[in-house]
């Protein structure tokens, strides 16, 4: 799950960079939503990995 947290963080950074660079005005709003969505998912996965809950246990071993 920690792998997915890192993937979500990278996707949110890329979405933010593309959305705020002036490529498209509409993409900025979508990038903001995706950034916060993936940020929340990444934080949840990191917390689960640290606590050793579910499949995150095998990642931390």
UniProtKB/Swiss-Prot annotation:
Matches recorded under Pfam families: DUF1328 (PF07043)
TM spans (from-to): 5-25, 33-53
Membrane topology classification: Multi-pass membrane protein
A single cellular component GO annotation: plasma membrane
Keyword annotations: Cell membrane, Membrane, Transmembrane, Transmembrane helix
Cellular location(s): Cell membrane
Primary location: membrane
Entries under HAMAP family matching the protein: UPF0391
Family to which the UniProt record says this protein belongs: Belongs to the UPF0391 family.
Identification of the protein by name: UPF0391 membrane protein Aave_0978
Native source species: Paracidovorax citrulli (strain AAC00-1)
